[in-house]
């Protein structure tokens, strides 16, 4: 699924922050996984990487519903 342009719940424009968050998420996962790209990490249900503080660190003013859309959406074009 692609990241929505606006939040389905509150209407906040998520699309304007999607590229910033995606770049920061890639760098954050690289540092947590010792330089491995997110595309090369094997699927493992026990692997947990907390991303909730990343939005706060970037200074993006979002509600919980918007955070959920950004964190849980995976752009399949990068993996297939």
Curated annotation (Swiss-Prot):
Keyword Mitochondrion attached: no
State the Gene Ontology terms under molecular function.
DNA binding; DNA-directed RNA polymerase activity; zinc ion binding
Keywords per UniProt: DNA-directed RNA polymerase, Host cytoplasm, Metal-binding, Transcription, Viral transcription, Zinc
Look up the record and give one Gene Ontology term from the biological process aspect: viral transcription
| Binding residues for Zn(2+) | 7, 10, 65-66
Q: Which GO terms describe its cellular component?
A: DNA-directed RNA polymerase complex; host cell cytoplasm
Annotated coiled-coil segments of the chain: none
Q: Cross-referenced InterPro entries, in alphabetical order?
A: RNA_pol_su_RPB10, RNA_pol_suN_Zn-BS, RPABC5/Rpb10
User: Principal localization?
Assistant: host cell
Where does the source fall among the domains of life?
A: Viruses
As for subcellular location, the record says: Host cytoplasm
Q: What does this protein do?
A: Component of the DNA-directed RNA polymerase (RNAP) that catalyzes the transcription in the cytoplasm of viral DNA into RNA using the four ribonucleoside triphosphates as substrates.
Q: How does it assemble?
A: Part of the viral DNA-directed RNA polymerase that consists of 8 polII-like subunits (RPB1, RPB2, RPB3, RPB5, RPB6, RPB7, RPB9, RPB10), a capping enzyme and a termination factor.
Q: Which family is annotated?
A: Belongs to the archaeal RpoN/eukaryotic RPB10 RNA polymerase subunit family.
What protein does this entry describe? DNA-directed RNA polymerase RPB10 homolog
